């Protein structure tokens, strides 16, 4: 373990897209790297890691097992990037991500996704013109958690393999959610594989499905479906845009201009209208009553 204040923890297997981050000398990064294998694959030759583990199964049960095996890691870092192995990023971007969340005091954040990424939530796609947007949603594939937030979330992580439903819940554990949750547009990464194809079979082999796990979280914590909403944003010029209506207009215009670059799922009039509707009316989910 080094003096780095950030930890990148990746659940990794065959066919990963993580090679650019595996052989970075410690002197070239401000973070430590932990690799937790979810299958029988091995570290490639030349990999430089501070932590290594093998735990067959899903993403989040592996993360729980990692911190159970290495409890000292829970106190060693200020921020934790719990990232999927099909995320493509370069070392400079990861260095900058940790610097960005530290500088802005975020407790829960994620990098935006490039427009050629496979994506679940439209709001997670990079929005040109913004440095970052304050949102109610950080998805489970690329979250960055502050240490205290991770400690609050860990008991919930113990209950899930897939993580389905975590992104409907963990914003409740942030101290000031309107200010400390963000999608960072200035530092996008690429999600390279189609959604939900890699770990689902391993989870189903253990007698459950991601949807069943989410249903249990919904029941246990009084959750409802959460749609991503941007409540404020900081532009490239440093100007702050406040309010759901103003952000709805800014996002609709910007994403419309980018629609031809969003090539994994179509973006047209219907998607733009749905984005604006949710921006204006969807509950934020910061508390049990949905606010």
Regions found by a protein language model. Name each.
Residues 75-88:
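Short beta-strand-to-loop acidic/aromatic patch adjacent to the donor-nucleotide binding site
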């Amino acid at each position: 373990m080094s003096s780095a204040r950030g930890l990148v923890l990746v659940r990794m297997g065959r066919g990963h897209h993580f090679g650019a981050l595996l052989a970075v000398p410690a002197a070239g990064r401000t973070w430590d790297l932990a690799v937790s294998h979810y299958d029988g694959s091995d570290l490639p030759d030349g990999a430089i890691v501070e932590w290594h583990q093998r735990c067959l199964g899903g993403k989040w049960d592996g993360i729980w097992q990692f911190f159970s095996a290495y409890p000292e890691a829970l106190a060693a870092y200020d921020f934790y990037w719990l990232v999927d192995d099909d995320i493509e990023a370069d070392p400079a971007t990861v260095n900058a991500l940790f610097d960005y969340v530290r500088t802005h005091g975020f407790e829960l954040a994620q990098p935006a996704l490039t427009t050629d990424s496979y994506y679940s939530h439209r709001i997670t796609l990079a929005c040109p013109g913004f440095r970052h947007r304050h949102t109610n949603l950080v998805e489970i594939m690329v979250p960055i958690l502050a240490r205290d937030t991770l400690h609050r979330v860990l008991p919930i992580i113990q209950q899930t393999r897939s993580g389905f439903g975590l992104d409907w819940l963990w914003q409740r554990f942030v101290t000031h959610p309107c200010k400390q949750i963000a999608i960072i547009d200035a530092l996008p990464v690429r999600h390279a594989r189609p959604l939900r194809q890699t770990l689902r079979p391993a989870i189903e082999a253990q007698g459950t499905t991601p949807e069943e796990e989410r249903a249990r979280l919904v029941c246990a914590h009084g959750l409802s479906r959460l749609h991503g909403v941007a409540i404020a944003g900081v532009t490239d010029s440093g100007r702050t845009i406040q309010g759901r209506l103003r952000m709805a207009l800014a996002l609709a215009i910007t994403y419309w201009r980018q629609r031809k670059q969003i090539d994994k799922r179509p973006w047209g009039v219907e998607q733009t209208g749905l984005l604006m509707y949710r921006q204006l009316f969807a509950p934020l989910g910061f508390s049990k009553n949905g606010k």
